[in-house]
Amino acid sequence: MALLVGGTLNPTTHLSLRSRAGRNSENVWLRSAASSQTSKGRFCNLTVRAGTPSKPSEPIGPVFTKLKPWQIPKRDWFSKDFLFGASTSAYQIEGAWNEDGKGPSTWDHFCHTYPERISDGTNGDVAANSYHMYEEDVKALKDMGMKVYRFSISWSRILPNGTGKPNQKGIDYYNNLINSLIRHGIVPYVTIWHWDTPQALEDKYGGFLDKQIVNDYKYFAELCFQSFGDRVKNWFTFNEPHTYCCFSYGEGIHAPGRCSPGLDCAVPEGDSLREPYTAGHHILLAHAEAVELFKAHYNKHGDSKIGMAFDVMGYEPYQDSFLDDQARERSIDYNMGWFLEPVVRGDYPFSMRSLIGDRLPMFTKEEQEKLGSLCDIMGLNYYTSRFSKHVDISSDYTPTLNTDDAYASSETTGSDGNEIGPITGTYWIYMYPKGLTDLLLIMKEKYGNPPIFITENGIADVEGDPEMPDPLDDWKRLDYLQRHISAVKDAIDQGADVRGHFTWGLIDNFEWGSGYSSRFGLVYIDKEDGNKRKLKKSAKWFAKFNSVPKTLLKTTNNNATVTASVSV
């Protein structure tokens, strides 16, 4: 779910936000008065090395350079069980915002109430019109030879009031989509929640700021399991909670748009130092309740999997020094560990506890036991990397999410003056495939090598790029994806248990704060021609890539198999 922000970010807010306010807000805390651009990320004070960085691959250079033919990845590099697919989210593609009984979501409310917060003043009312054109999306997947499709369920489409009586027409839409995917041999992977909370719950008690959301989310998740679980065997409870909490409650540039008084956001009535942690805590509790319910009642045959999709960023030390090595560890831990550590070990990273203090809620012993080791699969959404640089801050410094993020800055340029990689059409994404390899090896070495899917990975086309004047000739995206698919193979060769790669995204869509000005799709949406789907160069490459007969592929990947079939 890529994103970009509209509006001007306050350079004095110092919020450690991930560079994706549509993926458009580099770590907002690093925006200086000169509007320097940096990145997302969170940091922790671990003294243990968070994985050994992989050996540097061939330098990319300061600009995009196309791969040589022998460097381009081949399908037979991977086992036949390895899954290639694409991802989307409900609000970004569906449209039909008030049709067939759907209730308003927080994003409907945000875009309608604060249109100035979207860079082009648009909204998701129509989006890519996938509510009416989902068969075209399925056809595009089929044409590309994709075996899996990850999409999300709109909570307010199937539960207009967030709770209570379900909306059967909304359920019918997802049943029709799922059945169409299966008819075409494509396996559905479902994200239960991708940022679009029912506005009714926001109005009733403040959404994820109130613990009531835990039971209401559990009710929503159970409705999904009941309605779709006979065919959907792979679930993600939440998508990118880290980004959501920072941008929605810290910086206020995403729905519901809350921040502290005095900051520039839609609703300056919040507490940017506490609310992100409160919302995140309730997300984790809701995840635990839903997963426990799923395992107790909706996976009787043991053929289904459930997990969470985390937004992650790679980091390298700013220079070869102990302090910057430690800064790198803190960066990785705050960026990835905030939500990953609780679902693996039952609590937040030690560094977060020590730095944030009483602003970070506590788990009860029962909650810790329920949280830890619940995930069957992990999703990693990776786009880019940064350099981590140690920052000295006096002990009496006023707390901010930046200083929590732990005495480290996130830089696009290293101590030698070189950028971490070539910048893409989207200013916050610098291409650095090695960062993905390193993170996968961290998952292997530090977190027990769980089954991992790359649930998002891609770049955007932007209007006015002189190197890509034709929106269908997206050679930069193709080069980016080829290099990152190769990076996944590097990690697999070193023992990481990676099961699949989902490109973000399937189609051009509403990119949050950037509206429609940033296009992440493999498939072009022609707004001037009734949202007609047109395959880009990258999509046509996938069609060729995926055409290798299965008989020529290896049987397993790292001796690990994955359930890739469903019963109708």
Curated annotation (Swiss-Prot):
PROSITE patterns: GLYCOSYL_HYDROL_F1_1 (PS00572), GLYCOSYL_HYDROL_F1_2 (PS00653)
Protein name: 4-hydroxy-7-methoxy-3-oxo-3,4-dihydro-2H-1,4-benzoxazin-2-yl glucoside beta-D-glucosidase, chloroplastic
The UniProt record lists the keyword Glycosyltransferase: no
Binding site residues for a beta-D-glucoside: 92, 194, 239-240, 383, 456, 504, 511-512, 520
Distribution of this protein across tissues and organs: Expressed in seedlings, mesocotyl, coleoptile, leaf sheath, and roots.
Localization terms from the record: Plastid, Chloroplast
InterPro entries (alphabetical): Glyco_hydro_1 (IPR001360), Glyco_hydro_1_AS (IPR018120), Glyco_hydro_1_N_CS (IPR033132), Glycoside_hydrolase_SF (IPR017853)
Species assigned in the record: Secale cereale
Known catalytic reactions: DIMBOA beta-D-glucoside + H2O = DIMBOA + D-glucose; DIBOA beta-D-glucoside + H2O = DIBOA + D-glucose; Hydrolysis of terminal, non-reducing beta-D-glucosyl residues with release of beta-D-glucose
Recorded family membership: Belongs to the glycosyl hydrolase 1 family.
One annotated GO molecular function: DIMBOA glucoside beta-D-glucosidase activity
Lineage per the UniProt record: Eukaryota, Viridiplantae, Streptophyta, Embryophyta, Tracheophyta
